[in-house]
Amino acid sequence: MKNIEFMKEYLEENLVKGRYLHTLGVVETAKDLAKRYGVDIKKAEIAALAHDIAKNLSSEQLLKIIEANNITLSVDEKNTRELWHSIVGPIVARERFGIVDEEILSAIRWHTTGKENMSKLDKIIYLADMIEPSRDFSM
């Protein structure tokens, strides 16, 4: 797996500035929550860094990855392009950063919608994304 600095450099180059700053805020929020709730801080940091890795891909790029990986979208997912980055995110994180930890990949996958029986890490990334101090829901 790539190191944290490599991940930050890649994200700074590939996300719009506001999204990158949001990502750094999610990292700090996730680390604080992980510390508080006894979750591996390094896993929280990695998942938080990668949670929006696919956010700035075009709809066409996202759909191409979805189709190439034989992912079946629900009706709601098909009609809500804003969810596609979280569906594709784990695939891009695995390819770009070499992330293979299923717990981290799950946290990336479910950071927008949540799901039943979420792990503590899933919950931390979901919450950190929503509550990080600089969050701007217009991005």
Which stretches of residues belong to each language-model region?
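Non-catalytic terminal extensions that flank enzyme cores
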Residues: K2-I4
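Divalent metal-dependent catalytic cores for phosphoryl transfer on phosphate-bearing substrates
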Residues: F6-E13, R36-M139
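N-terminal glycine-rich anion-binding loops that anchor highly charged ligand groups
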Residues: H22
